[in-house]
Design a protein with these regions (language model features):
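Alpha-helical transmembrane segments of integral membrane proteins
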Residues: 2-9
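Amphipathic alpha-helical "stem/stalk" segments
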Residues: 12-133
Length: 133
C-alpha cells in the first residue's frame, strides 16, 4: 500500500517541481532582458547612441556603431535564449516585437548584421515577425 501511495504522490510532485523550475528559468531570462534595457536608460551617453542607432543615424562614429551593435546582439541573444527555452513563448514574441518596432535602424542592423550571428531557426522566427509587420 505504501508503494502505491508513493507511486501516486511522486509524479505529481515531479510535475510541480518541473513547473516551478520552468517558471524560474523564464523569469530569470526575462529579468535579464529588463536589466539590459536598464543600461540604456541609466547611461545618458549610451542612450544617445541607442536613440541615434534605432533611427539609422549615419553620424554614428565607429565606436558608437560598435556599441550599438554589441547592445543589439546582446539583446537579441537574450531573446534567442527565451525562444530556445520555449519557441512558443509570448515573452520572446513581445520582446522581439518591441525592439523590431522601435525604428528603421533596428531593421537595418538585423538585415546587415543580426541575422548572420544567430541560430538558423531563430533567424527564421525573426524573419517571420518582420514579414508580419
Amino acid at each position: 500500500m505504501a508503494i502505491l501511495a508513493v507511486a501516486i504522490f511522486l509524479p505529481s510532485q515531479l510535475r510541480l517541481q518541473h513547473r516551478d523550475s520552468a517558471e524560474s528559468t523564464r523569469t530569470e531570462l526575462t529579468s535579464g532582458i529588463v536589466q539590459w534595457i536598464g543600461i540604456m536608460i541609466t547611461d545618458p551617453g549610451f542612450t544617445n547612441i541607442y536613440l541615434r542607432g534605432i533611427e539609422a543615424d549615419s553620424s554614428l562614429d565607429k565606436e558608437e556603431q560598435h556599441r550599438f551593435n554589441v547592445f543589439m546582439v546582446s539583446y537579441f541573444l537574450r531573446i534567442q535564449q527565451l525562444w530556445d527555452y520555449d519557441n512558443k513563448s509570448a515573452d520572446a514574441l513581445t520582446y522581439a516585437n518591441i525592439m523590431l518596432g522601435t525604428g528603421p535602424g533596428v531593421l537595418n542592423w538585423y538585415r546587415d548584421m543580426g541575422r548572420f550571428v544567430f541560430k538558423p531557426g531563430f533567424v527564421e522566427y525573426v524573419d517571420e515577425l518582420i514579414e508580419e509587420e
